[in-house]
């Protein structure tokens, strides 16, 4: 198509000019590949949504938000972004991400809008996808944690006398994925320690059980969220 412009001067001379209209938008065939981008996807709040990519899936149930919203959804080979820092979620969205690395200690990590990273999930299904239900928008990607948790005594050294102390305390810490579980035995008997997670501290208040036990062996096992374990044995004395 084209525009036709007619120009005339004072003397009545006329000139016609044809200006072609160039179509700057080319038709493109959508491809189902790992770099498919759904930028600024409008999500209608009364509908369910399923996004299926080569290595990931996103399910957004209806009424996840208070109203219709726009999400910046980008899928890459090694990560997926679901972004809008201004909208809260009132239902969980479901994310499935293929674990191509297949390394011991792999997990799905999360990065928020401020760049802070944290553990998201280590749950794998039978197709080797990490599964996650979450109310957090941001970037999800695979990391590997190969570092065992830390166990160290807080208020004694191995072989110390603890007759004058009311508590026995340990620091347990996993800097990457966090603590999943811990177990403590004293003299081959399971003992219930209290866990103060904000202080990364395990502690136990001595009771009458220790009055008849001069030498005591304590065994601690700590496991992180991807299965890395640390086991330590200490000895302490009381009279």
Language-model features: locations:
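Short edge beta-strand/loop segments characteristic of extracellular beta-sandwich folds
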Residues: 61, 94-98, 167-175
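Surface-exposed loop/edge segments in extracytoplasmic proteins
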Residues: 114-123, 188-194
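C-terminal beta-strand-rich structural cap/linker in extracellular carbohydrate-active enzymes
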Residues: 129-148
């Amino acid at each position: 198509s084209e525009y036709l412009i007619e120009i005339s001067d004072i003397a009545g001379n006329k000139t016609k000019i044809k200006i072609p209209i160039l179509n700057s938008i080319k038709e493109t065939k959508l491809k189902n590949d790992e770099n498919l981008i759904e930028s600024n996807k409008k999500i209608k709040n009364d509908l369910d949504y399923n996004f299926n990519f080569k290595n990931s899936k996103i399910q957004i149930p209806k009424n996840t938000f208070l109203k219709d919203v726009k999400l910046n959804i980008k899928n890459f080979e090694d990560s997926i972004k679901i972004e809008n820092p201004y909208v809260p979620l009132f239902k969980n969205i479901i994310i499935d991400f293929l674990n191509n690395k297949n390394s011991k200690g792999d997990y799905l990590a999360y990065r928020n809008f401020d760049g802070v990273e944290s553990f998201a999930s280590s749950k794998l299904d039978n197709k080797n996808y990490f599964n996650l239900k979450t109310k957090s928008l941001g970037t999800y990607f695979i990391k590997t944690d190969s570092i065992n948790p830390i166990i160290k005594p807080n208020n004694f050294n191995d072989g110390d006398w603890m007759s004058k102390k009311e508590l026995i305390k340990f620091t347990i810490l996993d800097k990457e994925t966090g603590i999943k579980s811990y177990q403590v035995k004293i003299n081959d008997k399971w003992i219930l320690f209290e866990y103060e997670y904000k202080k990364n501290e395990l502690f136990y208040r001595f009771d009458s059980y220790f009055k008849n036990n001069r030498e005591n062996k304590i065994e601690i096992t700590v496991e992180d969220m991807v299965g890395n374990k640390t086991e330590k044995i200490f000895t302490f004395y009381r009279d």
